[in-house]
């Protein structure tokens, strides 16, 4: 059976089927048996499942299957799946039946570049995802569209911070830094100059460096628009589905990811759609690729949907020979990549939140067990709760003569990559304070202090020179000497990388002058996360407060007299 695109959005695209009663294996129950075929004959190693349950089996070399342990007397709904085929079924069968036949149909094996993307949003789109995947109370909804609409992926093309970096403006877009000045180097040609201190400075911008050259930023930020022109798509001018950022249909057309055979990360200079392989169907047909092998209609199962490799194209980036962002590669090198005991990107960033449907019941959304549906509310660098579960902070202290000696241990406990990761403007700051019983600060006599980029000045969040440590990948621009730099499209070097790999612990030590009175001393350590270096955030007008990730205090009791 082939469905038209219009019919599909109302039915197959929402991964539907009749909802059977919940089933679990039963000792001594009845059996169903049968065969899975395509037009050429039996299909070996096909997966046959009692729909929306954990009961499943695989076909033998002759395409035959049998399912044991079914409750007797109750009809079950069977589906079948195999790589390269649309999911087959549903077929209803009562236990005891041995002649069940499930037909599989191959889906397209090539990509149709002329395919027109299905829009996520209802507005202006006859066929869309919101129609079936959204609740009226979207703020508390667990349905995919409602979660995606609140997620950064759904706004990646219109993210004002991204556009301010792309265009060289402040957050409002109304103020812009001057176009980059260049000098001519006798050996290397044009080289950018530092900003003119006599001119307004709203921070760097790709388009300031390369006016008229769109670059490849849209390959990740507006992939549906950039797929046909990854090097010439200007995010300022994308329209239609392209403005939906990492939109639903794009992810559910993703069939393969290109990884370098040696490095096992995407090839250099191939970000986003440049490292993605799609299966867009021909006119009059559909193909939705997802994590369920029992979603019938023009849907198919892909194991890639459950793997970290799915995320790799947009979470690895190398510029001018420098690895700028690489959360995927960091995960690969960590213990989280263990195939048995590890965790995927999806496990942490698409956590199962208890959803039981991926479409509304009135749209025939199939009811599933809680814990089987990935959330599309993908928490990341702006999610306070996620950040507060990331690091463990331990503080020990002792009084030694006229000094209080402190040791602080910061452990990347729950991130499967470095922390912080990806965008090089992100940084994490450890602050260590000591105070007497009257809450007066004690003088620090150690050399472990925060750098200038932690903030110079008298504001409460100007931390430069205070006891503590900064964790960041600090880039320095080769030609201008600017550091730290977030203009990673320029030639840079990694001046230092103090970030914490997965499960790593960093130990720092501090000394404070103890109160002469011998009174109690309180040591407080705090870890805060900043989405950008303070000077950059100020120039851009990004009003993002520090996020407190962890805090710990110890009291050194009064010295005995």
Feature-to-residue mapping (PLM):
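Primarily the internal scaffold of c-type cytochrome electron-transfer domains
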Residues: 115-116, 139-204, 230-502, 510-514, ...
């Amino acid at each position: 059976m082939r469905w038209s695109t219009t019919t599909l959005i109302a039915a197959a695209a929402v991964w539907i089927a009749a909802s059977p009663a919940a089933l679990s294996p039963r000792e001594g129950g009845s059996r169903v048996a049968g065969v899975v075929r395509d037009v050429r004959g039996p299909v070996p190693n096909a997966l046959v499942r009692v729909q929306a349950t954990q009961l499943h089996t695989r076909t033998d070399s002759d395409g035959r299957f049998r399912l044991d342990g079914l409750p007797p007397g109750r009809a079950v709904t069977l589906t079948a799946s195999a790589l390269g085929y649309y999911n087959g079924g549903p077929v209803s069968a009562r236990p005891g039946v041995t002649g069940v036949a499930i037909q599989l149909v191959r889906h397209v094996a090539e990509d149709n570049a002329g395919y027109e993307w299905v829009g996520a949003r209802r507005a202006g789109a006859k066929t869309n995802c919101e129609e079936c995947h959204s609740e009226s109370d979207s703020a508390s909804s667990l349905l995919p569209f409602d979660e995606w609409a609140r997620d950064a992926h759904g706004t990646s093309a219109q993210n004002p911070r991204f556009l301010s970096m792309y265009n060289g403006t402040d957050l409002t877009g109304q103020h812009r830094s001057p176009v980059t000045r260049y000098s001519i180097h006798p050996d290397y040609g044009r080289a950018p100059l530092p900003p003119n201190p006599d001119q307004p400075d709203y921070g760097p911008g790709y388009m300031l460096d390369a006016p008229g050259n769109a670059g490849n930023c849209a390959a990740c930020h507006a992939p549906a628009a950039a797929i046909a022109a990854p090097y010439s798509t200007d995010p300022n001018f994308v329209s239609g589905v392209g403005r939906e950022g990492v939109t639903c249909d794009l992810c559910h057309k993703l069939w393969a990811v290109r990884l370098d055979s040696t490095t096992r990360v995407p090839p250099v200079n191939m970000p986003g759609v440049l490292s993605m392989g799609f299966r867009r169907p021909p006119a009059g047909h559909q193909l939705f690729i997802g994590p369920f092998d029992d979603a019938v209609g023009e849907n198919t199962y892909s194991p890639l949907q459950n793997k970290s490799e799915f995320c790799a194209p947009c979470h690895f980036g190398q510029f001018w020979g420098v690895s700028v962002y690489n959360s995927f590669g960091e995960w690969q090198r960590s213990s989280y990549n263990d195939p048995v005991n590890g965790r995927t990107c999806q496990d942490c960033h698409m956590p199962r939140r208890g959803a039981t449907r991926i479409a509304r019941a009135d749209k025939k959304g199939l009811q599933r067990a809680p814990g089987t549906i990935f959330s599309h509310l993908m928490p990341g660098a702006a999610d306070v709760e996620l950040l507060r579960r990331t690091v463990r902070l331990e503080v020990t202290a002792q009084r030694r003569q006229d000094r209080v000696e402190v040791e602080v241990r910061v452990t990347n406990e729950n991130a499967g990559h470095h922390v912080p990761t990806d965008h090089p403007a992100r940084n994490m700051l450890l602050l260590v304070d000591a105070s007497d019983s009257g809450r007066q600060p004690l003088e620090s006599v150690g050399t472990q202090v925060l750098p200038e980029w932690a903030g110079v000045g008298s504001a409460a969040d100007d931390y430069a020179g205070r006891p503590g440590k900064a964790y960041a990948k600090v880039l320095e621009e080769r030609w201008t000497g600017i550091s730290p730099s977030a203009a990673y499209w320029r030639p840079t070097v990694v001046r230092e990388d103090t970030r914490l790999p997965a499960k790593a612990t960093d130990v720092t030590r501090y000394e404070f002058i103890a109160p002469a009175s011998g009174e109690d001393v309180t040591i407080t350590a705090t870890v805060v996360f900043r989405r950008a270096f303070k000077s950059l955030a100020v120039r851009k007008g990004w009003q993002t407060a520090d996020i407190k990730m962890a805090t710990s205090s110890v009291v050194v009791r009064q010295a005995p007299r």
